Amino acid sequence: MSSPETVWEELASIDADPPTMRDKCTQCRRPVPVCWCPGLPKTRLSPASRLIILQHPAEVKRCLRTAPMLTFGLEVGKCLTFRGKKFPLLKHEGLSDILADTNTVMLYPTIASTTLNALDPVGLNGQKPYNLVILDGTWPQAKAMYHNSPILHSVRSCKLVGLPISEYVIRTQPTEGCLSTLETGALALSILEGNSQIRNELLGPLHYLCRFQLQNGAVTHQSKEWRIKQHTYPKLIGKRLAKQLRVLPED
């Protein structure tokens, strides 16, 4: 056992200055070596419609969140983010008017939800630009935000069908049909605008991030659904996910 004198000498030799922090990108605020900004569109996209992201506060702490990719990929004012657990609050300036707009639609599965593809794209039959509301959080968080915000119950709800497999390959999704916030917003916006190029351009930073991570030791992730079917998922699953998987057809 070390003597008290030795212990104090070792403590005294520890550098009192904090470790050097890595330089961060002034835009995405990620360390420069892992910045995904080079994947953003060369010119910010300016669709007629705009995205309205209602974000759970816990999302801010996630290091690989994708909502900022929408913020910096779209022209200023085309992607508005409001943070909270219920909406609208006094600090959410302008949100009440947006939610009351007849051209506002929300991606959320309800009994009355219609498929997004069934809506007229902007310009068809005089359709004006949409306000597309997306709840940003885990499914339990999104569900809580919806139920805690009565005004959302009066917003026309829509759903995406025939979803592609997520291209966010360095993150494990709950099921094969789950998409990141970026992928959801990009796909939905391209449908409402009738322009598939919007999706392709907005996904640029996600592709850049995944490519960099895979080149530096990350591995491709399969969904929890896929791994459970293959009996390779090590964790216990909740009752809700187990119920979902029981009704899904086997491949």
Please place each PLM-identified region on the residue numbering.
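Short metal-coordination and nucleic-acid-contact micro-motifs, chiefly zinc-binding Cys/His arrays
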Residues: 21, 31, 47
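Short Cys/His-rich local motifs and their 1-3 flanking residues in nucleic-acid-associated proteins
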Residues: 30-33, 37
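S-adenosyl-L-methionine/SAH cofactor-binding core of RNA-modifying enzymes
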Residues: 75-147, 151
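Short cysteine-rich clusters marking metal-coordination/redox-active sites
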Residues: 25-28
